[in-house]
């Protein structure tokens, strides 16, 4: 086994070397299109980019920019950073593949045959190098964007849970989980995509702790992973800012202290409670004190306080009461938490907060008013809006309006006004009228949420922008006739609508039309097309909006391609010779399918691996499609989001 580890390590570094050489030789020499110049600038001069920011990317890019001989080389050095980080991703992918393959080829065997060794190394090389030269990943690897860094974090944390799996029965195995939590916190400062691999991580943990796992247990583990993602995404990330804002208002507006005094007290208090909670849960001299410390920790992190206002506080109190009931065994000993689990949970939360603290860079640099200071997140309240991406608005995902929905109206006196709900207050620093006036925050407005008269489940066609409405119609065969009038493609259904006493009919898409758009555009065109670019082939690099000659996936097999898009031999020469054109004849796709089938039919361990890999793909692919709810006419191809 020692010889296997040596060979495995050497082959991993060999794949890193191949990827690093290829990416560095093909790296973008200057700044690419879209966000790359912005990210390079934020790294070089530590300026503040668009929400929600990428502070840890900024710090790393700044380090690499120091190696530039003059300012003209800065972009090149940041691009080299992406190339090396992507090569690191390939290396950890290799080690993950060999780990999974070894578990199925020779489980529990200390000494393996030469054939088994070649099989394991071959699987790792083929899988890692196939990803190395895939269209989307290669493109992201050679430019100064956050997705190369995000891919590395995903690869590392998945590899770490496999390392934990190898030593899970040892006394200090939890250190791998703590390291995963720290890297997860750091990854928030690069991109939130890394959180999506938590489902696969939880499944690996569950299957290791329950070798004879059943379907029910697997589903419960998946549900738990979704809760874990929600705790980080909707709890820790906005919660720290929210509770910090409460402290700031208390100390500034109530106690009359200077700006940021409440935030400083909050940070010191939070650190003290985290240290106390770690101490109590480690020594466990008093279960009562340990439980109180844990409850105080999750309260200070803002995890239970979903929403805003009184409802947020009530929900938080109920949440804390339920967690406390579990800790004290009110619901039975089965739901009680062991001292080791409690201590590990607190350590993981602490390390995640330490990693997440990279966002302090955003506030510090914004306070210096650099040339690029988007949204100016100089205090805890503007930071909250910055993290919440408030400028982009809300996207309905599970229930909400369609593109033709009308705002609900009501009569107030002699006027017809829209129905709305007052949201969270927006605070800003009050301008002083005299030097002696104390610092304070004032409410400048409340976030307003308008109510719609017509709503539907799982709304996929929701944007009321004129160009999007036209695109929805076109995806259902709509067109302009000779008179310039739209012939609608969406048949829809008519719903009565009371416009303050004036009855009108509103056309709403049917549930079937809504689902048809979801599968035909969002799933097929905006995901499977990108997926097959990398596993089958790509027609060209011209952005497509459904045309048969632009940006489609192809296989390289004329029978299939001509059936899908027409005779490809009749395309103009400039499209045939497009540099983005490549064909793999579906070989990577077939290899992937064969690998999944081989896993699925290798007994219980194989089927468990199958579900781990499946949900890693699902959460970093189709789950993003569900969450983004993309509109047609995207400004650029979005394949980078799924790499």
For the regions a protein language model found, what residue spans apply to each?
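Start-transfer (signal-anchor) and selected internal transmembrane alpha helices
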Residues: 1-22, 88, 113-125, 321-354, ...
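Transmembrane signal-anchor helices characteristic of membrane glycosylation enzymes that use polyprenol
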Residues: 5-33, 131-133, 191, 231-234, ...
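Membrane-embedded helix bundles of polyisoprenyl
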Residues: 12-18, 99, 103-139, 148-159, ...
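Transmembrane-helix motifs of polytopic, lipid-linked glycan transferases
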Residues: 13, 80-112, 156-160, 590-598
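Aromatic- and kink-enriched transmembrane "portal" helix at the membrane-lumen/periplasm boundary
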Residues: 24, 71-75, 79, 104-120, ...
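Extracytoplasmic catalytic/substrate-binding loops of multi-pass membrane glycan-assembly enzymes
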Residues: 27-39, 49-61, 76, 372-375, ...
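Membrane-interface transmembrane helices that cradle and orient dolichyl/undecaprenyl
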Residues: 112-118, 157-176, 203-214, 275-286
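Short hydrophobic alpha-helices at membrane interfaces in multi-pass membrane enzymes
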Residues: 118-125, 167-185, 214-227, 287-298
């Amino acid at each position: 086994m020692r010889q296997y580890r040596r060979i495995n390590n050497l082959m991993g570094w060999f794949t890193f070397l191949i990827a690093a050489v290829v990416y560095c030789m093909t790296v973008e020499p200057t700044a690419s299109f879209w966000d790359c110049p912005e990210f390079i600038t934020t790294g070089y001069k530590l300026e503040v980019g668009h929400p929600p920011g990428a502070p840890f990317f900024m710090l790393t890019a700044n380090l690499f920019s120091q190696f530039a001989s003059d300012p003209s080389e800065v972009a090149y050095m940041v691009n080299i950073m992406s190339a090396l980080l992507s090569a690191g991703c390939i290396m950890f992918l290799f080690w993950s593949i060999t780990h999974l393959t070894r578990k199925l080829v020779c489980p529990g065997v200390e000494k393996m045959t030469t054939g088994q060794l070649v099989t394991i190394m071959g699987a790792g090389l083929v899988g890692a190098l196939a990803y190395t030269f895939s269209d989307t990943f290669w493109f992201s690897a050679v430019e100064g964007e956050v997705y190369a860094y995000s891919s590395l974090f995903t690869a590392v944390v998945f590899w770490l849970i496999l390392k934990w799996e190898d030593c899970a029965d040892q006394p200090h195995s939890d250190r791998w989980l703590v390291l995963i939590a720290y890297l997860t916190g750091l990854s928030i400062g690069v991109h939130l995509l890394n959180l999506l691999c938590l489902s696969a991580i939880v499944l690996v943990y569950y299957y290791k702790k329950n070798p004879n796992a059943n379907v029910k247990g697997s589903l419960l583990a998946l549900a738990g992973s979704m809760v874990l993602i929600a705790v980080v995404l909707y709890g820790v990330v906005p919660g720290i800012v929210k509770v910090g804002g409460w402290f700031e208002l208390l100390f500034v507006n109530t106690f009359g202290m200077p700006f940021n005094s409440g935030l400083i007290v909050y940070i010191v208090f939070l650190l003290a409670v985290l240290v106390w909670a770690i101490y109590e849960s480690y020594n466990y001299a008093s279960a009562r004190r340990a439980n109180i410390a844990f409850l105080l920790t999750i309260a200070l992190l803002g995890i239970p306080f979903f929403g805003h206002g009184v409802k947020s506080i009530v929900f938080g109190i109920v949440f804390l009461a339920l967690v406390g009931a579990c800790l004290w065994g009110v619901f039975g000993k089965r739901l009680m938490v062991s001292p080791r689990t409690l201590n590990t949970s607190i350590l993981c939360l602490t390390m995640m907060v330490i990693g997440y603290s990279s966002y302090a860079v955003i506030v510090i640099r914004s306070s210096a008013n650099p040339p690029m200071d988007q949204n100016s997140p100089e205090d805890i309240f503007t930071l909250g809006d910055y993290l919440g991406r408030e400028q982009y608005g809300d996207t309905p995902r599970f229930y909400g309006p369609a593109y033709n929905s009308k705002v609900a109206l009501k009569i107030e006196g002699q006027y017809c006004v829209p129905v709305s709900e007052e949201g969270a207050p927006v605070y800003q620093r009050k301008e002083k009228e005299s030097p002696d006036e104390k610092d304070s925050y004032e409410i400048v407005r409340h976030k307003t949420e308008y109510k719609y008269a017509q709503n539907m489940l799982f709304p996929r066609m929701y944007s009321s922008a004129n160009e999007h409405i036209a695109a929805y119609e076109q995806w259902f065969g709509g067109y302009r006739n000779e008179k310039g009038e739209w012939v609608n493609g969406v048949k829809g259904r008519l719903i009565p609508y009371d416009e303050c006493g004036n009855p009108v009919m509103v056309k709403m898409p049917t549930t079937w039309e809504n689902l048809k758009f979801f599968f035909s555009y969002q799933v097929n065109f905006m995901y499977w097309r990108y997926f097959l670019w990398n596993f089958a082939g790509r027609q060209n690099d011209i952005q497509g909006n459904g045309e048969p000659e632009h940006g489609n996936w192809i296989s390289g097999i004329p029978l299939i391609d001509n059936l899908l898009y027409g005779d490809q031999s009749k395309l103009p020469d400039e499209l045939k010779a497009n540099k983005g054109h490549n064909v793999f004849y579906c070989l990577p796709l077939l290899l992937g399918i064969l690998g999944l089938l081989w896993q699925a039919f290798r007994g219980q361990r194989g089927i468990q691996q199958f579900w781990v890999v499946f949900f890693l793909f699902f959460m970093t692919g189709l789950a993003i499609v569900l969450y983004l709810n993309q509109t047609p006419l995207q400004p650029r191809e979005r394949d980078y989001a799924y790499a």
